């Protein structure tokens, strides 16, 4: 079952020691989309995975399998053509269905010309997370995959995005230990990106972001969404300071098929205008990176991958803004 914290704000911790790497603000722009490799069907994997849990829209190409090389090739070519420079791949645990697909994702990304990072979703071990176990888990991931040519890097360091759930499980004090020890044990260090917009996070991590702003854009008109983004995005950039600043755009949000307790924070697509307005304000805010939530989070209706209901409307809108931002 999917889950998302809608706007990541974790209370700051006084007295944290800076563990990240100081970056200047003159760095290459990126347009990165969150990617979910957890979908399976009987034709490829012998079973259904994730599709039966509920989806807001139907994929235009049908309920595909993320272990199908033809599907991944098609997705990555579409993303590349849209001006997306890389994908942030959801990561849960070693040996699961998503990790089994990682070699295919990396090989396809290299062939197409995309970068890959991971979204570290949960600290380890699951029942009682500790900084020590999380350090070991991250080092295992980095040692197996981060030397790949297509892994996203910043200042020469492999990038790892950390989701709010993982942040909350260890708190910032625990992540201080994780970052310190991983940087000590991994040659050259790592660029950690926190799913939290706060001064405390920007002091500890190498960059900050927010996975999904639907908690703030829900039930708003296009004009209200624009006003929110115009007021908020520059604050996100300012909070990052000299760290990597990110602004997140969404096409909409609808998780009402997941049987979650209501009321749900649904953001209307407004015929594609939600996405366009957020992109306009994101470019104007001049962050380092723009994040798209999402390429294919079908459970929460935030996908820009073509659907039967929305066609390729948002995907086709992406190149205009990506080119403007990346030039």
Region annotations inferred by a language model:
Residues 5-24:
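N-terminal export signals
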Residues 25-327:
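Glycan-processing catalytic domains of CAZymes
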């Amino acid at each position: 079952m999917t889950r998302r914290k809608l706007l990541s704000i974790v209370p700051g911790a006084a007295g944290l020691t800076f563990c990240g790497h100081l970056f200047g603000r003159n760095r290459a722009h990126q347009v990165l989309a969150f990617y979910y490799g957890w979908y399976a069907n009987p034709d490829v994997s012998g079973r259904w995975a994730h599709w039966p849990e509920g989806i807001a829209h139907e994929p235009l190409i049908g309920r595909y399998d993320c272990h199908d090389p033809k599907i991944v090739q098609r997705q990555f070519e579409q993303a590349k053509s849209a001006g997306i420079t890389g994908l942030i791949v959801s990561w849960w645990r070693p040996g699961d269905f998503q990790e089994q697909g990682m070699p295919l994702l990396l090989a396809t990304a290299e062939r197409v010309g995309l970068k890959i990072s991971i979204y570290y979703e949960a600290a380890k071990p699951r029942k009682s997370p500790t900084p020590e176990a999380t350090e070991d888990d991250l080092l295992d991931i980095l040692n197996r995959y981060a030397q790949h040519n297509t892994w996203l890097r910043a200042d020469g360091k492999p990038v790892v995005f950390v989701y709010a759930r993982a942040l909350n499980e260890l708190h910032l004090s625990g992540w201080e230990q994780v970052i310190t020890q991983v940087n000590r044990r991994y040659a050259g260090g790592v660029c950690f990106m926190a799913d939290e917009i706060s001064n405390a996070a920007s002091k500890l991590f190498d960059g900050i972001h927010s996975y999904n702003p639907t908690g703030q854009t829900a039930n708003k008109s296009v004009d209200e969404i624009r006003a929110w983004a115009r007021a908020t995005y520059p604050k996100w950039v300012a909070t990052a300071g000299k760290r990597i600043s990110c602004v997140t755009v969404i096409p909409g949000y609808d998780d009402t098929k997941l049987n979650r307790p209501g009321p749900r924070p649904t953001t209307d697509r407004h015929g594609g205008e939600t996405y366009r307005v957020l992109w306009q304000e994101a470019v104007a805010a001049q962050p380092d990176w723009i994040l798209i939530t999402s390429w294919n989070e079908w459970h929460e209706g935030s996908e820009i991958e073509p659907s039967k209901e929305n066609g390729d409307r948002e995907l086709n809108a992406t190149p205009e803004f990506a080119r403007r931002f990346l030039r």
